[in-house]
Amino acid sequence: MSADSTLIRIWDRPVRLFHWTLILLVALSFASAKSGAWALHYVSGYAILTLVLFRILWGFFGSENARFMHFLKSPLAALRQLGRIAKRDRDTETSHNPAGGWMVVVLLALLLTQAFSGLFASHDPGFSYSQHGPLALKVDEATSESLSALHLAVQRYLLLAIALHVLAIMLYKLVKGHELVMPMLTGEKLLPEGAKAPRLASGQLALGLLVLAGAAVFLFIRLF
């Protein structure tokens, strides 16, 4: 740590738990689909849907730097950020940078679409078996087939987005010297002296929003 740097807590526990739990659930979803472990696939899908809804709520009501209005900048700002990716400079971000902010939105949108379409999927032609989602029989066959095709297509875009996300993290570490993984593990980041720590929301609020998201998913599936 240099003399003019200080450790600042930038990521709250709810964001960090969301991030790492989501990684495990996405891996579990792919593995369970490939192996045909459908009960497990359903559970992981429900959990992903709940977590994504929670993160959307947290993006409006959660910690200061987790809110969309805090880290979402213009597309032009994101392009300028990417244009400086080869330039080694000092990391001053207390949230996602402009490009990273848009990647968060893209990943959330893809995960939401993937999990929602899976509820109604009837047959995935990309695999060697046939299986329907828990709500597939609640809609007509044409709708189920359309959502099945969407479920398969979004899977490819999701894998691409994840690969780009990991590549960007590696480039920021190796080229720019910015450490992005450890702050998401510990919550703390080494920033220039005088950097302002973001206001972090309470764990009780996070728990309440998580319960709300879970209840919404449960009621939708039961009452659809």
Label the model's feature ranges.
Residues 1-224:
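Membrane-embedded alpha-helical bundles that constitute the cytochrome b-like, heme-associated redox core
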